[in-house]
Swiss-Prot record:
One cellular-component annotation, GO: plasma membrane-derived thylakoid membrane
HAMAP family: PSII_PsbM (MF_00438)
TM stretches of this protein: 6-26
Similarity comment: Belongs to the PsbM family.
Keywords for the protein's UniProt record, in alphabetical order: Membrane, Photosynthesis, Photosystem II, Reaction center, Thylakoid, Transmembrane, Transmembrane helix
Protein name: Photosystem II reaction center protein M
Pfam families tied to this protein: PsbM
Gene (UniProt): psbM
Signal peptide span: none
UniProt source species: Acaryochloris marina (strain MBIC 11017)
Main location as per UniProt: membrane
Length: 34
């Protein structure tokens, strides 16, 4: 089923992008705090 591949990619992006965003925010806050 090709839909499964598309769903897996969409789910991976849906989880990956917010994680990167949070890591970038945390890095900015950490560098500012120190």
């Amino acid at each position: 089923m090709p839909v499964n591949d598309l769903g897996a990619i969409a789910t991976a992006l849906f989880v990956f992008i917010p994680c990167v965003f949070l890591i970038l925010l945390y890095a900015q806050t950490a560098s500012r705090g120190s």
